[in-house]
């Protein structure tokens, strides 16, 4: 079945521009990783889904499949999700070998089925990293990220009461860089894409968005030392600067944050040794 969706765009001249977006239904074959728990060996199982709308999100397609499995008396596929609008970072999975699927700067919940075509075979599996053990099926334990944040990814000094806007002057470039780094949603795509399972982009983003602002300055040195120490303790790998993390980050976090992190860590280490 083929239909058309109307998209209206306004311009400064108040004229309407209309785009016709074709939408259609498709039949797909899914190869999904099923694993009962961390100790289970796990493996792929194949499912056929029919009449999937091109305008469904990837997770909505999973909802349809799970409803069918439940009606058949089978156990539904376990997958993580919450906001379904690209904010929480919960819907983390490989889709055809790519974190979050084929679209760039996009989370799984924002991926629509028009990214695929009728008859496609789609392979879905959980993050593969020592620090992200599988809980069940496509759900992994990402609490290692939480422990890194608990080690120093916050501001604990008393910053006083809320003040008027612009009371603390901040250079525009620093404000822009901090804002861009703060876009990190902690989904773990950077770790999943890295051949070494490094978490430096995640840590770098957190260190940058706090350390660049005046409120985060007092704890700047202890923050980076403690967060790196916890990252190493969790078993994440080293960074070899391949750039795979930036390429797959759904929020486009730049690897310049890793360079900034290395600088911060070196300076903090020198001071701590004195």
Task: Identify the function of each model-found stretch.
Residues 10-14, 18:
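Intrinsic disorder/low-complexity segments
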Residues 26-46:
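Eukaryote-biased recognition of intrinsically disordered, low-complexity regulatory segments
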Residues 33, 50, 95-97:
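Short strand-turn-strand beta-turns centered on an Asx-Gly dipeptide
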Residues 45-56:
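Short, contiguous acidic and Ser/Thr-rich linear segments
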Residues 56-75, 122-274:
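Ferredoxin-type iron-sulfur electron-transfer modules in oxidoreductases and energy-metabolism complexes
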Residues 95-119, 124:
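Glycine-rich phosphate/adenylate-binding loop and adjacent beta-alpha elements
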């Amino acid at each position: 079945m083929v239909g058309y969706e109307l998209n209206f765009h306004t311009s400064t001249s108040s004229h309407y521009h209309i785009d016709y977006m074709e939408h259609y239904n498709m039949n797909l074959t899914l190869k999904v990783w099923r694993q009962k728990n961390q100790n289970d060996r796990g493996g792929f199982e194949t499912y056929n889904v029919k009449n999937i709308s091109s305008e469904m999100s990837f997770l909505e397609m999973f909802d349809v499949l799970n409803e069918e499995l439940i009606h058949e008396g089978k156990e539904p596929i376990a997958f993580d999700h919450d906001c379904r609008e690209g904010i929480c970072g919960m819907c983390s999975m490989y889709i055809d070998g790519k974190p979050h699927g084929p679209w760039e700067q996009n989370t799984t919940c924002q991926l629509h089925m028009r990214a695929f075509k009728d008859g496609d075979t789609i392979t879905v599996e959980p993050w593969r990293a020592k620090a992200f053990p599988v809980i069940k099926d496509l759900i992994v334990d990402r609490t290692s990220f939480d422990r890194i944040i608990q080690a120093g990814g916050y501001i604990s000094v008393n910053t006083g009461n809320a003040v008027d806007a612009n009371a603390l002057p901040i250079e525009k470039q620093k404000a822009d860089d901090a804002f861009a780094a703060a876009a990190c949603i902690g989904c773990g795509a950077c770790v999943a894409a890295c051949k070494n399972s490094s978490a430096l982009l995640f840590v770098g983003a957190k260190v940058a968005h706090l350390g660049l602002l005046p409120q985060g300055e007092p704890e700047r040195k202890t923050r980076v030392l403690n967060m790196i120490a916890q990252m190493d303790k969790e078993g994440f790998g080293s960074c070899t600067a391949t750039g795979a993390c930036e390429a797959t980050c759904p929020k486009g976090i730049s690897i310049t944050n890793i360079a900034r992190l290395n600088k911060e860590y070196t300076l903090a280490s020198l001071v701590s040794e004195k």
